[in-house]
């Protein structure tokens, strides 16, 4: 719906207030307009960012102060450890590599070659901005919280602190962004659904593999996902912003 169509609706709904503050009414109409990305889509993404940051802050606080979260982490990790099998361990050990630095950087390089060949320079810039950003914040989080990894149950040796999960954060950011770009280029809804579902499944499996292999707690993976979502939202905003030339009528002012 266009902002020009929303203004009369807001005037009817809010009456005196809307007529007294016409500039505010136009601003609200622009924020709810579906005609431009800077309208309702950007509003929803900004709200999603606020909710995600708030949830991430809550999780981070709870791993320090909440005995309940620590207990849930311990119980869930121990339950998976008790049911661990060699076949599934081998499967998840191979799968968890999709969140490793070597594989994600390799995929990023391959994507960069494709973007360079097709001269999609902004995609190239957005990709590495997100990769560097999420990597820096993972390092910052690990150093800030210095949370030890699960004791004596890891399927393989791994160093460093536990919160947040770098594999989960990077998988959410990289595969989420590439999946989003891919679905945007597809015309058939069915194809979009398949690509979107495959992307989500891969991200979830990478995160679950970290818990199953005993190298992260549940809250570590959740924190990694939330951090990755923040950067993914930034990537989506930058993508759509550069595709849409803002109309002065729909500016953020």
Describe the function of each predicted region.
Residues 95-96, 142, 163, 216:
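Residue-level signal for helical boundary/lining positions with a hydrophobic bias
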């Amino acid at each position: 719906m266009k902002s020009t169509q929303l203004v009369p609706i807001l005037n009817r709904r809010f009456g005196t207030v809307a007529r007294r503050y016409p500039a505010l009414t136009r601003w609200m109409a622009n924020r709810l307009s579906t005609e431009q990305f800077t309208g309702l889509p950007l509003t929803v993404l900004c709200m999603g960012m606020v909710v995600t940051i708030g949830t991430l802050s809550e999780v981070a606080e709870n791993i320090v102060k909440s005995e309940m979260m620590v207990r849930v982490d311990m119980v869930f990790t121990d339950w998976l450890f008790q049911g661990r099998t060699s076949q599934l361990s081998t499967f998840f050990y191979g799968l968890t590599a999709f969140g490793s630095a070597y594989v994600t950087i390799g995929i990023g390089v391959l994507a960069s070659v494709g973007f360079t060949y097709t001269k999609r320079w902004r995609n190239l810039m957005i990709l590495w901005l997100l990769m560097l950003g999420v990597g820096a914040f993972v390092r910052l989080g690990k150093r800030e919280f210095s949370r030890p990894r699960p004791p004596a149950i890891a399927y393989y040796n791994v160093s460093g602190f536990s919160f947040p999960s770098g594999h989960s954060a990077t998988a959410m950011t990289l595969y989420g962004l590439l999946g989003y770009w891919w679905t945007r280029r597809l015309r058939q809804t069915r194809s979009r659904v398949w690509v979107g579902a495959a992307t989500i499944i891969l991200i979830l499996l990478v995160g679950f593999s970290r818990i199953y292999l005993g190298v992260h707690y549940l809250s570590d993976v959740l924190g990694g996902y939330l951090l990755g979502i923040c950067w993914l939202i930034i990537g989506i905003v930058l993508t759509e912003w550069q595709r849409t030339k803002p109309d002065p009528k729909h500016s953020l002012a």
